[in-house]
Amino acid sequence: MKEFENPPPITVAIGLGRSGVAAARYLNDQGEKVQIFESSKKASFGKLSGNLEKEGIKVNLGVPLNFSSFQPILEKLALVIVSPGIPWDHPTLNQLRKRGIIVESEINLAWRALKNTPWVGITGTNGKTTVTHMLNHVLNNSFIESTIGGNVGKAATEIALALRKSTKHKPKWLIMELSSYQIETAPEISPEIGIWTTLTPDHLERHGSLENYFAIKRTLIANSSIRIYNADDKYLSKNRLNLPKGLWVSAQKYNSNINQLDFWISSNGMVIEQGNELFHSSALQLPGDHNLQNLLLVSAAARKIGLSGMAIENALISFAGITHRLEKVDKIIDIDIFNDSKATNFDSAEIGLKATSAPVILIAGGLSKQGIYLDWINQIKEKVCAVILIGESRVKLQHLIKSHGFRGEIVCYEKLDKAVDKAIKLGVKFRAKSILFSPGCASFDQYSNFEERGDHFKKLIKESSINYKL
């Protein structure tokens, strides 16, 4: 009789972020009994919680990630789904594992659902988002349907749910950006093509060392059938013998190791594939040598997928770049203004400075991260006439920049609002060519993510520019 049947097992998804919500909806659609645990009680969660409850997903707000939170449902708990931001070795997760409860990541759940469609797995400290968008653009422009997701765009389980419900043609390729947090929790993922853009110190507060960070990224590439590497990255080149065989690309026009390369750019700017000219690199309109590296990584993948050089060239001509990455947002009194909010570490911020015309007014700061800063400071000394620092790290960064010999003006503000107004005034004063918002820090001291931070910057620029365009 029904009243004596065992109650259905419970699945808990951790967090009301993009991944947690997507996983909960995916499993709920499969008929699972799903709850979400969210440690915050933010009022902004009210509408989302209400919508999820209507769908049959119970939302528990103000529930911390500790073992006692699970005890009321422990006997019925079968599965816990974890978002990328939660450390894989979190003590509570280890306690649950000891009780025999399965702990799985959102990205691994998605892999099991989507593995019959070939993946391009793209990882790296910097460059992976641009490569993801650029490759997706090239494929779709060439009538090869693809979808992006993972660490950018839609959560992977959101894609899985959409494809399950869709009556349309399925995409031929999934272009998935994968962070070290995701790779660490999903050793099963085996892309058809794996792309490794760069490797510099990042997320060391979680991974402990650069060697551990390297080993995690390497897992994804080792699992890939076709591997593509950036030979211009010092760490990757140095560790070439420790990496599985693959294709190597270089944007350095006079690379001394040209015999070890598969794709490169010639002295006259032509993209070369193993000695054969494909097209001129000027097809891509984005500034900076780093974007030539991105072009080559995308070209190598596109060629393996089957596109001609002409098809790649035609697609690149119309690629306008991505939001928040060296995004030109305005021009005020002959000063170009760039939103580079996606620069969340020193290495990425250094790349932004390299690609920007001097003299530069730099706005930087936020929540500080571990990393190597000397190259970033050298770029500041070479190209920047004034620095405006914001956020939690502003005093620390001011001391750092001054102590390394920067002689320009440095101003500190807590909030971005005052920084933008000051940047324009300093730009006029010093006849700057560029104002660059390239934080070199995480956004979480004042914003939910780098996108929110970048949107705020663009809003402030729009408001301020009115005074200079009357």
Swiss-Prot record:
GO BP annotations listed: cell division; cell wall organization; peptidoglycan biosynthetic process; regulation of cell shape
UniProtKB keywords: ATP-binding, Cell cycle, Cell division, Cell shape, Cell wall biogenesis/degradation, Cytoplasm, Ligase, Nucleotide-binding, Peptidoglycan synthesis
Enzyme kind, highest EC tier: ligase
Superkingdom to which the source organism belongs: Bacteria
Cell compartments where the protein resides: Cytoplasm
InterPro entries for this protein: Mur-like_cat_sf, Mur_ligase_C_dom_sf, Mur_ligase_cen, MurD
Enzyme Commission identifier(s): 6.3.2.9
Swiss-Prot/TrEMBL catalytic activity: UDP-N-acetyl-alpha-D-muramoyl-L-alanine + D-glutamate + ATP = UDP-N-acetyl-alpha-D-muramoyl-L-alanyl-D-glutamate + ADP + phosphate + H(+)
CC terms in the record's Gene Ontology section: cytoplasm
Residues that coordinate or bind ATP: G124, T125, N126, G127, K128, T129, T130
Pathway the protein contributes to: Cell wall biogenesis; peptidoglycan biosynthesis
A matching Pfam family: Mur_ligase_M
GO molecular function, one term: ATP binding
HAMAP family reported for this sequence: MurD
Record-stated family: Belongs to the MurCDEF family.
Name of the protein in question: UDP-N-acetylmuramoylalanine--D-glutamate ligase
